[in-house]
């Protein structure tokens, strides 16, 4: 039997929504000052929320695909949906990340280095160790290409992992008679 689900529309809609919500979440973190919080607990919480947003949209896309496919779904189909949704969102977030780090907050990487330096200083590192570490971080500032590719790769890998997990839970093979 052929698949009736409209793959392109499902992944495009959910990928665009995930990318848009991801940007809105990043703007919210920036506007509230939580982006540079320095609190480990807050950092963990914001990461968990970010992952939950991805799970929500990828699970929704997989369920829509399954519903459009007469209730049937293979793990491979779920992975395909998850990866494509993740890549579409990743492309959107990649453009935003480049815009953010070059126009909105061009001091982003220096702020990140300063935050890490504060945390390491609190752990008791010597001034010399801190200087060596921050100098190394500054030398390895990502290029625009790396800044662009990071969300794209993360989106694809995240979609792969989430698609596999969600697909394993929601799979329902067609009868082979």
Q: Which residues make up each language-model segment?
A:
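Transmembrane alpha-helical insertion/packing segments
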Residues: 1-61
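Alpha-helical transmembrane segments of multipass membrane proteins
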Residues: 21-29, 50-54, 89-93, 97, ...
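Functional transmembrane-helix hotspots
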Residues: 95-123
């Amino acid at each position: 039997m052929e698949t009736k689900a409209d793959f392109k529309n499902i992944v495009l809609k959910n990928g665009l929504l995930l990318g848009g919500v991801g940007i809105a979440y990043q703007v919210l973190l920036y506007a509230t000052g939580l982006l540079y919080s320095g609190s480990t607990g807050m950092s963990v919480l914001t990461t968990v929320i970010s992952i939950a947003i991805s799970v929500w949209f990828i699970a929704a896309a997989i369920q829509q695909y399954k519903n459009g496919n007469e209730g049937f779904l293979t793990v491979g189909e779920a992975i395909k949906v998850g990866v494509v949704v993740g890549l579409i969102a990743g492309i959107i977030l990649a453009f935003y990340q480049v815009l953010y780090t070059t126009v909105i907050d061009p001091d982003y990487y220096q702020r990140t280095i300063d935050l890490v330096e504060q945390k390491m200083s609190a752990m008791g590192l010597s001034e010399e160790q801190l200087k060596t570490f921050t100098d190394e971080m500054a030398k390895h500032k990502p290029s625009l290409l790396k800044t662009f590719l990071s969300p794209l790769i993360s989106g694809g890998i995240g979609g792969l992992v989430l698609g596999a997990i969600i697909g394993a839970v929601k799979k329902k093979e067609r009868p082979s008679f």
